[in-house]
From Swiss-Prot:
UniProt keyword list: Membrane, Transmembrane, Transmembrane helix
Principal subcellular localisation of the protein: membrane
Residue ranges of the TM segments: 100-120
InterPro entries (alphabetical): Transglutaminase-like_domain
Recorded GO CC terms: membrane
Species annotation: Pyrococcus horikoshii (strain ATCC 700860 / DSM 12428 / JCM 9974 / NBRC 100139 / OT-3)
Localization annotation: Membrane
Gene3D superfamilies named among the record's database cross-references: 3.10.620.30
Assigned protein family: Belongs to the UPF0252 family.
Taxonomic lineage from the root: Archaea, Methanobacteriati, Methanobacteriota, Thermococci, Thermococcales
Domain of life: Archaea
Protein name per the record: UPF0252 protein PH1321
Membrane topology value: Single-pass membrane protein
Length: 337
């Protein structure tokens, strides 16, 4: 029954150059006369090595040696093998597993959601004060195709030179007229089919009134036309340019009341400019907001709010995170370290 001592001594000798302190412990265990106690102490050594913080290859090699001799030791001492003779499951090579999928979800869904909330047009923009005169040759306004698809040119031909303008009488002060004009356009239908079209043309106020429907640019021109015709001057048109929007963005008319710019947009109540920006910012990624000041004889691009574009270096960071994450998750499976 002394064979178990010889097995432990052989294990100690094999570990002598790899882990001297563990080898010495095994030498001491080999002196124990009780087989059960010796086996129990051997198991404690295996556990100690598995929990050691040391170089991975060294630890793995030591565990392989301990496991091999432990299996032989258990067979020698007990007929019922249960500690070392468990079948090892074959490692299956998988390039993609749930850990990889979870990491990709974190990198491409969670992180962009967080960073998009951190970036906001309201906090990341600057203002250019231009007071730039906006004009277009009057004789060219006779040719509809010259301004049919350009909103800025359409403002000149419709609001300055009166092409396709209408006469609608409003009552009250400037605020009441603005509210009534906003209510007037909100009773019309929004032409979503035109929004989906790859090429969006501009309607005159007369056409919008005739069809009883339009898009944001049509309603902005209509409101500005009605208010100017009712001696509310100046009026403003706010043109918001957004990223990846086929129609080019959003337009709405506005008026100043008591020093505050109020936006008169289709389908909503009169809204303060800052609140309007917040609402747009939640829906689209704003690139710039152009403020046009309009009177009967002059249209001026008064100012532009321009976004400070986010840094694209995050794309490189994402790539590094992905490669590093795959390396960490799969290093054992690929036997990298």
């Amino acid at each position: 029954m002394q064979e178990y001592k010889e097995l432990i001594k052989e294990c100690a000798k094999e570990l002598e150059g790899l882990m001297p302190e563990i080898s010495q412990k095994l030498v001491n265990i080999a002196k124990i006369n009780s087989p059960d106690r010796a086996f129990l102490e051997y198991l404690k050594v295996v556990e100690q090595v598995s929990l050691m913080k040391t170089e991975r290859k060294q630890k793995n090699k030591a565990l392989i040696i301990l496991w091999r001799y432990g299996e032989a030791l258990e067979k020698e001492l007990y007929s019922d093998v249960k500690f070392f003779a468990k079948p090892l499951h074959k490692r299956i090579f998988r390039f993609v597993d749930w850990k990889i999928i979870g990491m990709l979800f974190l990198v491409f869904i969670i992180l962009p959601a967080i960073t998009s909330n951190l970036w906001s047009f309201r906090s990341e923009h600057y203002v250019l004060y231009l007071n730039e005169n906006v004009d277009f040759p009057r004789e060219l306004c006779n040719y509809r195709t010259s301004w049919l698809y350009d909103f800025r040119t359409s403002m000149v031909c419709v609001l300055k030179y009166g092409y396709g303008s209408i006469n609608v009488t409003l009552r009250g002060n400037s605020w009441e007229k603005g509210v009534e004009a906003q209510r007037f356009i909100s009773d019309m239908e929004y032409d979503f089919d035109r929004v989906k079209s790859p090429i969006t043309y501009i309607q005159t106020p007369k056409e919008t009134l005739r069809y009883k429907k339009g898009v944001c640019s049509d309603f902005a021109l209509l409101v500005a036309n009605i208010l100017l015709d009712n001696n509310v001057s100046p009026v403003y048109i706010v043109h918001t340019v957004v990223r990846k929007e086929p129609s080019g963005g959003h337009a709405a008319a506005g008026i100043y009341v008591n020093g505050t710019l109020w936006i008169l947009d289709w389908g909503s109540k009169p809204t303060k400019f800052q609140e309007y920006l917040e609402n747009i910012d939640r829906i689209w990624e704003i690139r710039e907001v152009r403020i046009y000041r309009i009177t009967r004889d002059r249209i001026t691009l008064e100012r532009i709010y321009k976004a400070r574009l986010e840094d694209d270096r995050w794309r490189f960071l994402y790539s590094v995170i992905i490669m590093l994450g795959i390396f960490i998750l799969k290093r054992r499976e690929w036997w990298i370290m």
